[in-house]
A protein has these predicted regions:
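Phosphate- and other anionic-substrate recognition elements at nucleic-acid/protein interfaces
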Residues: 3-5, 12-148
C-alpha cells in the first residue's frame, strides 16, 4: 500500500489541509488550520504528516495568471523553507515537498460550495479546506496521468 500525501492551501490567516486516501486516488478535506505563527503552524502540519503516515507534502503555489510571482508567491517560498528547515531539525528527511499550481482553486472551491448550496457563513469556514482538496486531487491526477 502506498503512503498518503498531504495537500496544503496556505493563506495568511488559515491553512486548508487535505489528505489522499491510502491508494493515492482521491483527496479528502481534513481541516482548516487557523494560523498562529510559522513555528506552531509547521509543527501542527508535521504532526499530521506523521499521524497520516504521509510521504509527500503538496503545497499549492499561488502565481499570477500570467505565471509570474506575486506577493503571496514569495510568502509560499518562505513557508516552504521554514517547513523544510523544521523537517530537517526533527529528522523527517524522507518526506518530499512539492509545488502544485493552485491558480483559481479558491474560485473553483467557492463555485463547488455554492452549487452544493452551502451558506455563505459555512463557505467561509470550509473554503480553504476545499481548495486544499482541489490542489491535492490535481496532484494525484497528474501522478495517475504520468503512470499511463
Amino acid at each position: 500500500m502506498m503512503k498518503r500525501k498531504i495537500g496544503l492551501d496556505v493563506g495568511d490567516k488559515t491553512v486548508g489541509i487535505a489528505v489522499s486516501d491510502p491508494l493515492g486516488i482521491t483527496a479528502q478535506g481534513l481541516m482548516t488550520l487557523e494560523r498562529v505563527g510559522i513555528r506552531k503552524d509547521t509543527g501542527k502540519i508535521l504532526d499530521l504528516v506523521k499521524e497520516y503516515d504521509c510521504d509527500t507534502i503538496v503545497i499549492g503555489l499561488n502565481k499570477k495568471l500570467d505565471g509570474t510571482d506575486s506577493i503571496q508567491t514569495e510568502k509560499m517560498y518562505e513557508f516552504r523553507t521554514m517547513l523544510e528547515n523544521k523537517m530537517r531539525s526533527t529528522g523527517m528527511k524522507d518526506i518530499e515537498v512539492v509545488w502544485q499550481d493552485e491558480r483559481l482553486t479558491t474560485v473553483m472551491a467557492e463555485k463547488v460550495l455554492i452549487e452544493a448550496d452551502v451558506s455563505r457563513k459555512k463557505r467561509k469556514q470550509v473554503i480553504d479546506k476545499q481548495a486544499a482538496v482541489l490542489i491535492m486531487q490535481s496532484y494525484l491526477d497528474s501522478l495517475a496521468f504520468q503512470k499511463k
